[in-house]
Design a protein with these regions (language model features):
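Metal-dependent amide/peptide-bond hydrolase catalytic core
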Residues: 2-202
Length: 202
């Protein structure tokens, strides 16, 4: 009861510590003095030796608390459960397993290990046919190298259609046009996460 909170075990107070750890995971750098190394560490070959170059191209991963839920018998009672939803965006070299482990390894999660459960959302909504195909709610990072044949084919097609210069353009516009098309990335998830991200089909 709220009149004697010391007799209870306040789940919201415990979650408050987890929330601060999640914020640190997103905002900290990766220096040796940090207990929680920030997600920016994946841009460093020390932490991501096989994929750091792709991670630098794509950008660092991020995490943010997007929802919080609790249960309590009433407004004048100690909360007996609390859960959060974390929106975690991955970069090259990360997997959903590594992302879950990062949360499990947060100091607050270890401190309250017997009370903490870290899991992934599952999609289980029925299709229009009524069929339910349960699957993990994660969207793997993917990248197509600029040197890949299908990417180069698109660049060649662009050159064939538009060239590299505009004969009618002034010098400033011509300079901006040089080297086009720009082969770059979007910094958010796309529909390619299943076809390319899971199955490697460009």
């Amino acid at each position: 009861h709220g009149s004697a909170p010391e007799r209870g075990d306040n789940a919201i107070h415990k979650m408050a510590e987890v929330l601060l750890n999640v914020r640190d995971l997103n905002e900290n750098d990766a220096s040796d003095d940090k207990e929680i190394k920030g997600l920016v560490k994946m841009l460093d070959p020390k932490y991501n030796p096989e994929h750091y170059e792709d991670a630098r191209f794509l950008g660092r991963g991020t995490c943010t608390t997007s929802q919080i839920f609790y249960t309590s018998p009433s407004r004048c009672a100690v909360a007996d459960s609390c859960s959060i939803s974390i929106d975690r965006r991955m970069t090259a070299g990360e997997t959903y397993q590594s992302c879950l482990k990062e949360i499990e390894d947060l100091p607050a999660c270890k401190k309250y290990a017997k009370d903490v459960k870290v899991s992934m959302y599952m999609y289980d909504r029925p299709a229009w046919t009524g069929h339910v195909y349960e699957t993990e709610c994660f969207f793997p990072t993917w990248i197509n190298k600029a040197s890949a044949p299908h990417v180069q084919a698109l660049v060649d097609a662009h050159h064939a259609l538009w060239g590299n210069t505009r004969l009618w353009a002034d010098e400033t516009a011509r300079e901006k046009r040089e080297g086009r098309p720009l082969t770059d990335k979007w910094t958010f998830s796309t529909n390619g996460v299943s076809i390319q991200g899971r199955y490697g089909i460009p």
